[in-house]
Amino acid sequence: MAMLRSGYRRFGCLRAALKSLAQTHHRSITFCIDPSLGLNEEQKGFQKVAFDFAAREMAPNMAEWDQKELFPVDVMRKAAQLGFGGVYVRTDVGGSGLSRLDTSVIFEALATGCTSTTAYISIHNMCAWMIDSFGNEEQRHKFCPPLCTMEKFASYCLTEPGSGSDAASLLTSAKQQGDHYILNGSKAFISGGGESDIYVVMCRTGGSGAKGISCIVVEKGTPGLSFGKKEKKVGWNSQPTRAVIFEDCAVPVANRIGTEGQGFLIAMKGLNGGRINVASCSLGAAHASVILTQEHLKVRKQFGAPLARSQYLQFQLADMATKLVASRLMIRTAAVALQEEREDAVALCSMAKLFATEECFAICNQALQMHGGYGYLKDYAVQQYMRDSRVHQILEGSNEVMRMLISRNLLQD
């Protein structure tokens, strides 16, 4: 037992497993869960870069970031040097200009090293994409370059204390006075709140409903912008979560992204990609959990034999692997549909987010169970993957909302 504990303590087994995973496509043995299956050579190349970065820079630190609630700014900026700060932002403003499928491949790989940190990076990317896609040339060249290098960090501000799933009922107001908007209201559960430099804010410039919402960029340090206390969370502890508060906060009209009344459309377009991104983060957590369980079953002995000889546990592992691969296929199908702007892309993104976040959490939870008492210790990575992936069923549109969007597509006339 002492040897087993020392082998796993402080996530040492995780680092070794991820290093091995990063080298998988160079090996003669191909496992059925190989994440490079179906990818072209270029995609395999940047996937390996992401896996290597996850194993080298993230996995050795994920436990400390979680337990000390550290926001790993320096490591994220290293990720940005590899092009991960603006993965699907256009190249003329510093982005990598990659596809939605490419982005999913990268976020899955990074999430094996730290799911929480990768999830923040994915939100940051979504904000940069919104500005790149809907901003004018001046806005694109002002905001996107420092976001792509992660010199500056971004937060997405949609949810409010009184409007979660019913986002179109948001109350934060922006009243124009001359060449400024005066913002009043608050946003809740904002990832990066208080630490980010740029806040992409959905606020009400017109009447009630979705058509009265606009998108405005608020920069940190603007008078009237403040933040609530840092929330204590079950997971996602490597990224701070705070309320974002606006009290007579004057923001230049020039910071409005798109036209007045276009904000809800921008928000929903961003979330379609955000759902692929967060599902990919769940996929990375589940993939790492399967790898760790695979190793644990070979090493841990009970009743005089390795756990890997138990047919029941073999079947459990097989189910986990099957759910993992099915999730990956759904995510990648939806990513391609979104890239091609297919009419069913919203439903497919919703399906992928719904299925992958639920099944991948189930994989992480089962991995903890199969580690026995060790899985419940914070010295072992499986518990962190389970905690960090749980919230994915709630954010970027709850899975109940995903079911609404899917059924709406099916029942349309």
UniProtKB/Swiss-Prot annotation:
UniProt xrefs under InterPro entries: Acyl-CoA_DH_CS, Acyl-CoA_Oxase/DH_mid-dom, Acyl-CoA_Oxase/DH_mid-dom_sf, AcylCo_DH-like_C, AcylCo_DH/oxidase_C, AcylCoA_DH/ox_N, AcylCoA_DH/ox_N_sf, AcylCoA_DH/oxidase_NM_dom_sf
UniProt entry keywords in alphabetical sequence: Acetylation, Branched-chain amino acid catabolism, FAD, Flavoprotein, Mitochondrion, Oxidoreductase, Transit peptide
Residue sites binding FAD per the record: 156-165, 189-191, 300, 310-311, 369-373, 398-400
Binding positions (substrate): 165, 272-275, 408
Positions carrying N6-acetyllysine: 48, 229
SUPFAM superfamilies listed in its UniProt record: Acyl-CoA dehydrogenase C-terminal domain-like (SSF47203), Acyl-CoA dehydrogenase NM domain-like (SSF56645)
EC number: 1.3.8.5
Superkingdom of the source species: Eukaryota
Subunit structure: Homotetramer, formed by a dimer of dimers.
PANTHER family given in the database record: ISOBUTYRYL-COA DEHYDROGENASE, ISOBUTYRYL-COA DEHYDROGENASE, MITOCHONDRIAL
Protein's name according to its UniProt entry: Isobutyryl-CoA dehydrogenase, mitochondrial
Organism: Mus musculus (Mouse)
Gene from which this protein is expressed: Acad8
